[in-house]
Amino acid sequence: MKGMADLYTGEDEMWRIIDMGEEHDGAASNSVCYAIKPDHYNGTHPEEYSKTWINLNTSLTEELGVQHSALSTLYPPQGFIGWHNNANASAYNIIFTWSEHGEGWFKYVDPKTQEVITIQDEKGWNLKAGHFGIYGSGDVVYHSAKTDCYRMTLSYTLGHDEDYWKDCIDFITS
């Protein structure tokens, strides 16, 4: 798995996806992770799991006033999501990430400078916020993530209201 993570989150793959231009549909095509929404759960006690998940998701969406959970994923050690840009789901977003030991990262290409930025996970909960643009907008954000420990991501989209997005960030961080 580690070789796959390095391959699909590496520089060669980044350039391959970027060079595809609009031929890339925006979604990640390579990952090692597990969807954690109830409709993907195959474990014991599915009713209890579903109820717990719905309560958590409802609490977050009501508290933040958001409507859409874009991604809810658990990455195992050596898990990853390969380079992609979410041009198929353009919106302001808030991304909560929990990391078991802080041995993961989120990388993105700054759409203005083309610099590759790495945000190292810290142990526990982390918050990232950004905007994933559509093709032609000047703010398409290519990104990937990788971890060597358990890592969970809960991502919510907020539409295209920048002021509301900023208010949410202020609320969460105050």
Which stretches of residues belong to each language-model region?
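Nucleic-acid-interacting cores, centered on viral/eukaryotic replication and modification enzymes
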Residues: 81-83, 150-154, 158
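Secondary-structure boundary elements
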Residues: 58-65, 99-103, 161-163
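Ligand-binding loop in jelly-roll beta-barrel domains
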Residues: 136-153
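Low-complexity intrinsically disordered segments
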Residues: 159-164, 168-174
